[in-house]
Amino acid sequence: MSGHNKWASIKHKKTATDVKKGKVFTKIIREIVVATKESGAQIENNARLRKAIEDAKEANMPQDNIKKAIQRGTGEIPGAIYEEMVYEGYGPAGVALIVEVTTDNKNRTASDIRKMFSSHNGNLGEAGCVGWMFERKGYITVKKSAADEEIVMNTVLEAAVEDFKSEADSDVYEIITLSSDLETVKNVLKEKNITVESAEVTMVPQTQIALKSDNAKNMLKLMDALEDHDDVKNVYANFDISSEDMEKLNA
């Protein structure tokens, strides 16, 4: 199983706790504000806003919160001014990381990110130091229990996806598309009544670094620390941890 999918699974388990902390709401509200400011409030013409609202509903965010976030994005009501920033660096064993943030204070955020890297055997690098190791792609998952593998595979191959994976130790099918084709492939699956578990634009590493023992433990702690920060939107990394080692770490 890929490191990306393992981390996606860990994040999924954390979601319920994060909602209680309000972290998920905070991050989704910022995404709605930025998406609205960027491309307007009409969801039929704004795929990014549409995805953010879907995430908000999945997290059971009150409709009033969604409405106010959109109004902040259009400027109808006042609010913080957010900037989107990207940080790049290295984690344990030279793992490459890309950290996307949405912040109203870039100096504070940069300081926080730098401290997290250094306290987990990593270091923050210069812009572009690791970005070339990743490609922006569409990433879709479908629960194996939701549909037959052959049906899902034939459906997505007809839609000209880049890759289809069905790993033995995973409970989902993984589908990789061009980032521009994500919505199209997602809609093709829905037309075939195949339930999509998740669909997002992500950064896929061209190669991965296998981690074990302390390096694996420190890497997961760094990922956890970064994703727990209110300003952090996404974290991408090119590590892989075997299922056996992951079970030991979770024991």
Curated annotation (Swiss-Prot):
Pfam families noted in UniProt: TACO1_YebC_N, Transcrip_reg
Q: Does the keyword Transcription regulation apply?
A: yes
Does the record's keyword annotation contain DNA-binding? yes
Q: Which UniProt keywords apply?
A: Cytoplasm, DNA-binding, Transcription, Transcription regulation
Q: Name one GO cellular component term.
A: cytosol
State the Gene Ontology terms under molecular function: DNA binding
This protein is called: Probable transcriptional regulatory protein TGRD_462
